[in-house]
């Protein structure tokens, strides 16, 4: 695969690596961006392992709870200007309410919304506002108590990040604090048992490669890897993370101290994982001039 300047720039932007290091990483991994990031980490050359490109999608995440059931829905628009539009926000709120009864995005798009489907409602709104929109994803959560939190709220119940927390015991104040923690820290899973084994194995392999670069005895390397993996899991899982409200306790310990148990969570962030290629201003003007 040809290693283009654009690929090198993307890797440099996401890792902070130097130009020659980024080019070598891509050459060694045949242009595979994720593998190149891991290669840089192994060599100690990546300043930040951001494995996704810049997120440029706009829109809102809305959260709704009814009884012990909650749902978070992401509805995308092309610009933040539309996300601030009251008509768009009203539509997102109605879509989120309908999502409580939907199992997935396809079912939600087919759901009735005031006499027409959600899909048809979106089509009509696109025609009115003049900008493309889509329901990207939804996530549901059930529990004894489900608490919501919205970060960067555009209006009640919707914003740039939406969080649901399911609990047994405790009170809403604790749930809100945990939800704010989740919004800020973005844990990968509730506990070690719920972590993606592929992610864990990949991290273990990276740490093995880093440790072996040290040239230390195998017994020492095994201890190094064990310690680093414990730290990785602790930093990645909600219940083991230091609670932002009280760093002396983990989230799990803080919940237990309050007589509560966190049983699940959902976190959706607008545009998360979407990479949108940006044209430079001159190219944008040229395209507009061509109609």
Curated annotation (Swiss-Prot):
Cross-referenced InterPro entries: EF-Ts_dimer_sf, Transl_elong_EFTs/EF1B, Transl_elong_EFTs/EF1B_dimer, Transl_elong_Ts_CS, UBA-like_sf
A GO term for molecular function: translation elongation factor activity
Record CDD domains: UBA_EF-Ts
PANTHER family: ELONGATION FACTOR TS, ELONGATION FACTOR TS, MITOCHONDRIAL
Cited Gene3D superfamilies: 1.10.286.20, DNA helicase RuvA subunit, C-terminal domain, Elongation factor Ts, dimerisation domain
Protein name: Elongation factor Ts
Protein family: Belongs to the EF-Ts family.
Keyword Protein biosynthesis applies: yes
Region (Involved in Mg(2+) ion dislocation from EF-Tu): 79-82
Keyword Cytoplasm among UniProt keywords: yes
GO cellular component: cytoplasm
Gene: tsf
Keywords: Cytoplasm, Elongation factor, Protein biosynthesis
Organism: Ruegeria pomeroyi (strain ATCC 700808 / DSM 15171 / DSS-3)
Pfam family membership, one: EF_TS
Role noted for this protein: Associates with the EF-Tu.GDP complex and induces the exchange of GDP to GTP. It remains bound to the aminoacyl-tRNA.EF-Tu.GTP complex up to the GTP hydrolysis stage on the ribosome.
Subcellular location: Cytoplasm
Main location: cytoplasm
